[in-house]
UniProtKB/Swiss-Prot annotation:
Function: May be involved in redox reactions associated with the formation of disulfide bonds. May contribute to the quality control of protein folding in the endoplasmic reticulum. May regulate protein folding by enhancing the catalytic activity of UGGT1/UGCGL1 and UGGT2/UGCGL2.
SUPFAM superfamilies, alphabetized: Thioredoxin-like
PANTHER family, per database record: SELENOPROTEIN F (PTHR13077:SF6)
Subcellular location: Endoplasmic reticulum lumen
Name used for this protein in its record: Selenoprotein F
Signal peptide (residue range): 1-28
Organism: Sus scrofa (Pig)
Family to which the UniProt record says this protein belongs: Belongs to the selenoprotein M/F family.
GO CC annotation: endoplasmic reticulum lumen
Length: 162
């Protein structure tokens, strides 16, 4: 019994094909491929899922299901730990040997950071001490070779701005 054009078999077959394709796509999105399968598909074992988001920019959306099956979720960034304060220790007589640190100390930039103190300690090379909530030293870093921008950027990440 052959199906005539416009008969019931044509739409039913089309619907079945559409349903099968949809199921195949859904299973591909949920599947994680083995590392060997991913290599065969041309994906790196270090593929991050964020890279799959970029496929659309290059008209490569047909690769998205395989990409999602091979990718690894990116690790969530740690929340930034802000310190209660910091002490920048430097010897006034040695400050001229560290012009970048001198430029930072003598500028208005230290006033931008809550809890930052500048202490002049005789004979001390430039050191940054980060303080915990109790005022204890949590970290101590030599900033001998840091430039002004590095000091400011680091403090921006570690202290609250005023």
């Amino acid at each position: 019994m052959a199906a005539e054009p416009g008969g019931w078999l044509g739409p039913a077959l089309g619907l079945r094909l559409l349903l099968a394709t949809a199921l195949q796509m859904v299973s591909a999105f949920g599947a994680e491929f083995s590392s060997e399968s991913c290599r065969e598909l041309g994906f790196s074992s270090n593929l991050l899922c964020g890279s799959c988001d970029l496929l659309g920019q290059f008209d490569l959306l047909q690769l998205d299901p395989d990409c999602r099956g091979c990718c690894q979720e990116e690790a969530q960034f740690e929340t930034k730990k802000l310190y209660a304060g910091a002490i920048l220790e430097v010897c006034g007589u040695k400050l001229g040997r560290f012009p970048q640190v001198q430029a930072f100390v003598r500028s208005d930039k230290p006033k931008l950071f809550r809890g930052l103190q500048i202490k002049y300690v005789r004979g001390s090379d430039p050191v940054l001490k980060l303080l915990d909530d109790n005022g204890n030293i949590a970290e101590e870093l030599s900033i001998l070779k840091w430039n002004t921008d590095s000091v400011e950027e680091f403090l921006s990440e570690k202290l609250q701005r005023v």
